[in-house]
């Protein structure tokens, strides 16, 4: 069940307007960051703020439409977007799910981070101000075909993406925290290719 939540969260698993400084940070990040790599933690909280799930891993993306998220603890899961298809590999189950990339992502955080820089096309943008010395931004997806109601993003003084929060219609909140962010690293094209392991069950297209 938790793994299902994890994959749904990702698909829901990467906007927005604040005061002038935050607008500049967001647009600068989207326009100038063609690729990135970071460690992350992902915490899922229920409507009462109780932790349901906590996982850690490494993410990479390269525009347009390529990304790789490796969930490492407490279990392994790999999510890859190769520009055309979305691959989800559950290591424990040796099971692969594959979908068309556009159908899998839509107006999602992953689409935002690894897609084009036309932010306003998929999101309604509003100001949420400054908290804990971070500029917070809110994005509400224009499409109704998403499993979340809004995304919050926070940038530090260096215009680095530090936190993302996803809120869904059940009151759940998923908090992604990024560390050791590297902007525009040279990433191997092999990172964004996926071949199902021998013997794996493949579901989908």
Q: Language-model segments: which ranges?
A:
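Beta-strand elements of well-folded, non-transmembrane domains
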Residues: 44, 61-63, 159
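Gly/Pro-enriched, hydrophobic low-complexity segments
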Residues: 121-126, 130-205
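Positively charged n-region of N-terminal signal peptides that target proteins for export
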Residues: 1-4
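An acidic-aromatic
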Residues: 58-107, 174
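Amphipathic hydrophobic-ligand
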Residues: 52-58
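Flexible, processing/modification-adjacent segments and terminal tails
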Residues: 21-46, 50-52, 80, 89-149, ...
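Bacterial N-terminal signal peptides
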Residues: 7-16
């Amino acid at each position: 069940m938790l793994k299902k939540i994890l994959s749904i969260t990702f698909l829901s698993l990467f906007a927005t307007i604040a005061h002038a400084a935050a607008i500049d940070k967001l647009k600068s990040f989207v326009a100038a960051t063609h690729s990135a790599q970071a460690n992350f933690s992902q915490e899922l909280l229920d409507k009462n703020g109780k932790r349901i799930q906590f996982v850690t891993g490494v993410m990479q993306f390269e525009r347009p439409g390529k990304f790789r998220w490796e969930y490492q603890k407490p279990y392994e899961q790999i999510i890859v977007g190769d520009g055309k298809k979305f691959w989800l590999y559950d290591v424990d189950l040796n099971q692969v799910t594959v979908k068309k990339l556009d159908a899998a992502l839509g107006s999602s955080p992953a689409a935002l981070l690894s897609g084009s820089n036309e932010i306003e096309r998929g999101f309604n943008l509003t100001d949420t101000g400054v908290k804990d010395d971070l500029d917070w931004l809110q994005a509400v997806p224009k499409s109704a075909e998403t499993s979340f109601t809004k995304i919050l993003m926070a940038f530090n003084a260096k215009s680095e993406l530090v936190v993302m929060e996803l809120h869904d219609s059940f009151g759940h909140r998923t908090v992604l925290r990024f560390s050791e962010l590297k902007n525009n690293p040279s990433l191997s094209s092999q990172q964004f290719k996926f071949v199902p392991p021998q013997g794996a069950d493949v579901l989908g297209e």
